[in-house]
């Protein structure tokens, strides 16, 4: 599989990294938290791109996309996705989100339904109320040093 395009788009004050693979009906891949394109979808990409135009993004503070000074919220990330789709000329797409990406896909469908044809959601929460308090506490105190050496960081 070859990458058709590897680029950055300026959306909502963010310099968002994305890749486009293949041709056909657009499919947007939205990765999980503390992950990126390769760690969430690397093994799936070649098969998905055989019959689809796969648009894989790296959201705020993940992979090649730097963090900016704004809350990391589903609503903000959903607005980034629709801004990217507009910028690259995609009117409507199927969204496949995993974990954090599933929440972003869900918010995209709720807030910007005109962009969404179909949703595939894996391991999704609607909001943080569905998460264990211990998990939220761990996330709140996590640092880059805590993640050093983990598979998520080695593969970025």
State what each model feature region is.
Residues 55-57, 98, 122:
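The conserved SAM/SAH-binding core of class I Rossmann-like methyltransferase domains
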Residues 9-67:
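Conserved HGGG/HGGXW glycine-rich cap/lid loop of the alpha/beta-hydrolase fold
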Residues 151-156:
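Helix-loop "lid/cap" segments that line or gate small-molecule binding pockets
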Residues 58, 94, 117-120:
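Residue in the alpha/beta-hydrolase core beta-strand immediately N-terminal to the catalytic nucleophile
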């Amino acid at each position: 599989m070859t990458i058709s395009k590897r680029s950055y788009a300026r959306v909502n004050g963010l310099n968002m990294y994305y890749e486009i693979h293949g041709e056909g009906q657009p499919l947007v891949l939205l990765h999980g938290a503390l992950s990126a394109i390769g760690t969430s979808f690397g093994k799936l990409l070649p098969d998905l791109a055989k019959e689809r135009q796969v648009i894989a993004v790296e959201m705020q503070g993940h992979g090649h996309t730097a963090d900016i000074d704004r809350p990391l919220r589903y609503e903000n990330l959903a607005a980034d996705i629709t801004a990217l789709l507009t910028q690259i000329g995609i009117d409507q797409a199927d969204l496949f989100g995993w974990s954090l990406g599933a929440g972003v896909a869900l918010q995209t469908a709720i807030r910007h339904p005109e962009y969404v044809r179909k949703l595939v959601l894996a391991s999704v929460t609607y909001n943080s109320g569905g998460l264990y308090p211990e998990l939220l506490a761990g996330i709140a105190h996590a640092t880059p040093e805590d993640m050093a050496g983990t598979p998520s960081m080695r593969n970025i």
